[in-house]
Amino acid sequence: MPALGEILLVPETDKGKSKDYIEVSEDEKITRTRSRSLKKKAIKASNKLTHSLRKRGKRVADQYAPIVIEDVRDEEEEKAVNVFRKALVSLDLLPPRHDDYHTMLRFLKARRFDLEKTVQMWEEMLKWRKENGVDTIIQDFVYDEYEEVQQYYPHGYHGVDREGRPVYIERLGKIDPGKLMKVTTLERFLRYHVQGFEKTFSEKFPACSIAAKRHINSSTTIIDVHGVSWMSFRKLAQDLVMRMQKIDGDNYPETLNQMYIINAGNGFKLVWNTVKGFLDPKTTSKIHVLGNKYRSHLLEIIDPSELPEFLGGNCKCAHEGGCMRFNKGPWNDPEIMKLVRSRDAMYKPKEMGLLENGEVAKLFSLRHVNTDMSSPDGGHVRERESHPEHDKRAQLSNQAEAVGVGRMEQSDSTSPLPNNLAVERSLTTSLQKVASFLARFILQLLGSLCLMFRILGRLVNKQPENQLRPELSVSVSQQQVPPPQVHPCWLRLQNLETMVTVLCDKPSSIPQEKEDILRDSLDRIKSIEQDLQKTKKALFLTASKQIELAECFENLKESSSTGMRSCWPRHCRNFQAET
């Protein structure tokens, strides 16, 4: 007699042929009627299962597919971030909002991985954010004069470079400082500047990361100094630019990838070569001063379709009010922004390498790792370290479930199977599951029975020997009991007592002499910082004076060249002047 699964999977046409050529006995009729009733029940159950799966597939199809973001990390940097994070947690200086691997890495790089200086910088950043309400500045602050400010100070983001970073452009030659300060105030402009940075971190950088499928937290800057009047620009630079630079350096460090200063004259290049010696080599390597022939340099890093036409690109944005008003970039794509707001993307370290990008993008979602810290030293990670085998099993089971759901949704959305084939497949899978469950249950039952028989056999075999020779059993039990090991515990207690006495002998507070030394060193550091600020201002003033002298020198050259081109010789000109 055929098996039950074979009876259920026989097509109707084959059954019709068997009726024509084979006489059916009574026993076979009973088995077939039972199999048909069982088949009807299985079809109903499979229909319910397929309907629920189809509904689920439709719900998932309405969502946007998650995207994998490649996250490359250096082993040494990761260790430094772990140490820095532990220090912040111990000092209660790590809010959940800033519990991010890349944020902490930027601050460490800004202080050259000096832990004490980085902790101090982090503490000052948190204090500054609390005093100025930066955490809610996107919702609270409304900059109504934005359009007027754009007229007198054209600036903004436009497109991305070839590596996916946002491109920030400023046209300093178009600045009118007098009208700009009439339209807005210095404090409001600085708050607008901070709000722009917060939007960059919450919208632009995540959108660029999703579009490029790699983590991005820095930008490329282009500053056009064509037509800059340094006489009118001096006061604005002292008040506005210096304060903006301080805000950026103290609270948003390491966000500049490369800066290109274009249309720079000879005077600016002369001053830059002088000032460059006083700056950090790492900072100067990011700044490139270019003249009028800048187009080839910009096209090496930015695609022509992403570069505005006035900078040598092909983008015009005429229907959107110009390139500086359109704010072109991935952050204007509604699908990408929906992923950003729902956090439906996943960071994948490069060393993982589970699947290809397209396959992993269909299977995983950030909702499983949303609020966990991207640095690998969180509480959840410590639990994984304590139970590595359990973590591997859970990861493999999650991957298997995700693969099954992804395949089922893909087959349901692309090419639906016929009803008979779907029923047959569902029946085979259900029967396989039932068979595997029964096999496991029987094996477990047999194993437990064997174990019970072994235990009972040992008890039966040992019982008469113990009854015949009770003295031997008592002696053996006495021999098996080990003597109490008190000596090691006593030694450990003595060691602990000595350690406690040593700690008690130490003073509870720092001596007054050391406190005075620390205060003196802090006062010296503050005075040095003040002197540095003064030297910065003096350098800026001398630089502006050098630029003025260079411009005057160029004007004198032009005037002397026009005088030399005159048709009258010098003695004739003197003769004309005397007459």
Swiss-Prot record:
Cystine residue pairs: none
Span of domain CRAL-TRIO: 145-319
PROSITE patterns found in the cross-reference section: CRAL_TRIO
SUPFAM superfamilies in the cross-refs: CRAL/TRIO domain, CRAL/TRIO N-terminal domain
SMART domains in the cross-refs: CRAL_TRIO_N, SEC14
Superkingdom: Eukaryota
Main location: Golgi
Residue stretches of biased makeup (Basic and acidic residues): 379-394
Keyword field contains Membrane: yes
Function statement: Required for transport of secretory proteins from the Golgi complex. Catalyzes the transfer of phosphatidylinositol and phosphatidylcholine between membranes in vitro.
UniProt family annotation: Belongs to the SFH family.
Official protein name in the record: Phosphatidylinositol/phosphatidylcholine transfer protein SFH9
Originating species: Arabidopsis thaliana
Gene: SFH9
